[in-house]
């Protein structure tokens, strides 16, 4: 059963109780990313959702994240890992780069959208506002803050986050890996889950838009 009014929207420059509730759930170390992991790896038919964003994440009565709105989803047949693209699907601000290259798509488009959403929740800023405005793209801004060791810029006025900068850094690193321009560099949701639960360590991410001849590894 889904909670009434249970979809929470990340709003720019504002930390409403709804936003904070969702942040508490998604940024909690025990989060298993189960909803997305399930449709990618645990269903009998693999599903690419194609429209992962905060508005499509619902919380049930136990505050467990559930995915909603499968209207744009693609089903992958047995042994199939990619699907032909029949036009861009999703929401501005969350599109993976391969949508614009007319390339075949995989579950990695959802991983990209998850990374954007994670950055939104960390920063309490909307990627859509960044995409429509004249400001630097949120993903580039977040990476620059990470590279320059200025993560505090991402969490202005968030004293709770400032009290655990090590945890914040892990979350930002995961998000940066998820938004890599090269889909082959993005981790699976299973690996994302393992890192968030501190089951495995994660390596230093490259620039999201940087292609290298020797791809780095997500796992240390």
Residue ranges and their predicted role:
Residues 1-220:
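Conserved eukaryotic protein kinase-like
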């Amino acid at each position: 059963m889904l909670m009434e009014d249970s979809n929470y929207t990340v709003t720019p420059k504002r930390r409403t109780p709804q936003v904070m509730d969702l942040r508490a759930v998604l940024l909690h170390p025990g989060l298993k990313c189960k909803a997305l992991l399930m449709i990618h790896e645990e269903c009998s038919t693999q599903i690419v959702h194609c429209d992962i964003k905060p508005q499509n994440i619902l919380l049930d009565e136990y505050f467990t994240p559930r995915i909603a709105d499968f209207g744009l989803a693609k089903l992958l047949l047995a042994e199939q890992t990619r699907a032909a693209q029949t036009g861009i699907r999703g929401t501005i601000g969350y599109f993976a780069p391969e949508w614009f290259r007319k390339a075949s798509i995989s579950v990695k488009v959802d991983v990209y959208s998850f990374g954007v959403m994670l950055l939104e929740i960390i920063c309490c800023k909307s990627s859509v506002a960044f995409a429509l405005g004249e400001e630097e793209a949120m993903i580039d801004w977040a990476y620059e803050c990470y590279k320059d060791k200025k993560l505090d810029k991402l969490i202005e006025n968030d004293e709770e986050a400032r009290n655990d900068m090590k945890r914040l850094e892990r979350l930002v690193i995961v998000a940066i890996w998820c938004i890599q321009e090269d889909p082959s560099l993005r981790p699976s949701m299973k690996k994302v889950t393992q890192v968030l639960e501190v089951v495995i360590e994660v390596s230093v991410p490259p620039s999201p838009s940087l292609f290298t001849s020797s791809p780095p590894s997500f796992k240390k």
